[in-house]
Regions:
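Phosphate- and divalent-cation-binding pockets in alpha/beta enzyme and binding domains
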Residues: 47, 72, 76
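The conserved acidic donor/metal-binding loop of glycosyltransferases
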Residues: 127-131
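Catalytic-site signature of metal-activated, phosphate-bearing donor transferases
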Residues: 2-29, 100-108, 133-284
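Active-site-proximal specificity loops/subdomain of glycosyltransferases
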Residues: 14-29, 75-125
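Active-site beta-to-alpha loop of glycosyltransferases that engages the nucleotide-sugar donor
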Residues: 32-34, 39-53, 68
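Gly/Ala-rich phosphate-binding loop of Rossmann-like dinucleotide-binding domains
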Residues: 56
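Short beta-strand/loop segment that forms part of the nucleotide-sugar
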Residues: 60-71
């Protein structure tokens, strides 16, 4: 697959001159799989080894988009046995509008590549700082043919607290890393069947279109706010600089220097992971 052309069997998304395909474990290509995963990332070397090992227990193959990382993310991806293909971008777009459009384009490109090179029954779309709890592979295998087209997963943010503020280290698992979580529940579409009518169009972010029957199940821990105090500040700066101010920049400006929490960002009590958290969940 050369830059500037679509992978065979696809039609919507083209590689740009700044993007190149890196083949990982070629033994995964051209084989039928039950569950394949796609992800997009930038500078995730700190958590990426654990992310790939965690995903490797659940999925058959991974396709990744690296958005011009300046750390070792690409090398980590290339060496992992479950990573089949990588799109490595060399030119990161700083423009606010371009960043928003890139979310759907990158995932659309990955989805089409997976369909062309990794025939599969189900797709799992994840971010590196997310950990779905429970038996993901077993859950998908247990879905009957007429159960649903897609699955939304209940996601909760983990928080740094006064008695749990040590930074994440790469020698430990990210799953259950933090003790406390906010009750705000976001239902994120992460799983869908490999059907041609399901796909990404221009303007889509994380969620593709074309699903008719969607159920909500499973739970997910999100660590985007809780890896470390330094990472929190970097996250604030990223949203302030590269996303629309009214919808993202304003609230993240107000969160600067507020990494350690006693309440959630929405001023609600924090809970340990488990039934009490779920019973107090507030959909947002």
């Amino acid at each position: 697959m050369a830059a500037g052309v679509t992978p065979s069997g696809t039609s919507n998304w083209q590689l740009r001159d700044s993007e190149r395909i890196i083949r990982g474990n070629e033994g995964l290509l051209g084989r039928k799989h039950h569950l394949v995963a796609i992800t997009r990332l930038r500078n995730e070397a700190l958590i990426l080894p654990d992310t790939l090992d965690y995903l490797g227990d659940h999925v058959d193959a991974i396709v990744a988009y690296d958005d011009a990382s300046t750390d070792d993310s690409v090398d980590i991806l290339r060496k992992h046995p479950k990573v089949a293909l990588i799109v490595a971008n060399q030119a990161w777009e700083k423009n606010v509008a371009a960043r928003k459009l890139a979310e759907g384009r990158h995932r659309g490109l990955l989805l089409e590549m997976a369909r062309a090179e990794l025939p599969h029954d189900w797709m799992f779309c994840f971010d590196p700082d997310e950990r779905v709890t429970g038996d993901l592979r077993g859950f998908v295998a247990g879905l009957s043919a007429d159960a649903c087209d897609a699955v939304r997963v209940r996601l909760f943010d983990a928080y740094i607290t006064p008695d749990d503020c040590e930074p994440y280290r790469p020698d430990r698992a990210l799953l259950d890393f933090r003790r406390y979580y906010g009750p705000e529940q976001r239902d994120i579409l992460m799983l869908w069947r490999n059907r041609p009518e399901i796909g990404f169009a221009e303007g889509h972010g994380r969620t593709p279109g074309g699903m008719e029957r969607v159920r909500t199940d499973l739970y997910c821990q999100h660590y985007g706010k809780s890896l470390s105090v330094d990472h929190w500040e970097e996250t604030c700066d990223y949203y302030i600089r590269h996303f629309p101010f009214e919808t993202y920049g304003r609230k993240w400006s107000e969160r600067k220097c507020q990494a350690i929490h006693t309440l959630s960002d929405f001023m609600r009590p924090l809970y340990e992971w488990g039934d009490t958290l779920f019973a107090n969940a507030v959909k947002i």
